[in-house]
Curated annotation (Swiss-Prot):
Signal peptide: none
Amino acid composition bias (Polar residues), ranges on this chain: 9-19
Name the record gives this protein: Small capsomere-interacting protein
Broad class of the protein's primary localization: virion
Coiled coil start-end: none
Compartments, as annotated in UniProt: Virion; Host nucleus
Family recorded in the similarity comment: Belongs to the herpesviridae small capsomere-interacting protein family.
GO BP term (any one): viral process
Region of interest (Disordered), residue spans: 1-30
Entry's Gene Ontology cellular component terms: host cell nucleus; viral capsid
Function: Participates in the assembly of the infectious particles by decorating the outer surface of the capsid shell and thus forming a layer between the capsid and the tegument. Complexes composed of the major capsid protein and small capsomere-interacting protein/SCP assemble together in the host cytoplasm and are translocated to the nucleus, where they accumulate and participate in capsid assembly.
Length: 88
C-alpha cells in the first residue's frame, strides 16, 4: 500500500484547481466575445463580473445568443437605474 504525503496531495489539488480556473476563464472569454459580441476590455464592468460566471456555466454549445444579449441589456439597464437612483 502506498501512502500519499500531504504535500503531494496538496500539489495535485493545486494542479487540478489551476487547470479548472484556466478553463473557467476560457469559457468566460468565449461567452464575452463569441456569444455576447463584446470586446475583451468590457469584462471589467461590474455587471459583466456577475453575468459572465453565471452564464459561462450554462453555456452548452447550442445557445440562443439573442436571449443572452437581451438578458445582459436588461441587467445593464437595471444597474444604470439603480446607480442613478442611489445618487439622487
Amino acid at each position: 500500500m502506498t501512502t500519499i504525503r500531504s504535500d503531494d496531495l496538496s500539489n495535485q489539488i493545486t494542479q487540478i484547481s489551476g487547470s479548472s480556473k484556466k478553463e473557467e476563464e476560457k469559457k468566460k472569454q468565449q461567452m464575452l466575445t463569441g456569444v455576447l459580441g463584446l470586446q475583451p476590455n468590457m469584462a471589467s464592468h461590474p455587471v459583466l463580473g456577475v453575468f459572465l460566471p453565471k452564464y459561462a456555466k450554462q453555456n452548452g454549445g447550442n445557445v440562443d445568443k439573442t436571449a443572452f444579449r437581451l438578458d445582459l441589456i436588461r441587467m445593464l439597464a437595471l444597474h444604470r437605474l439603480n446607480t442613478k437612483t442611489g445618487s439622487d
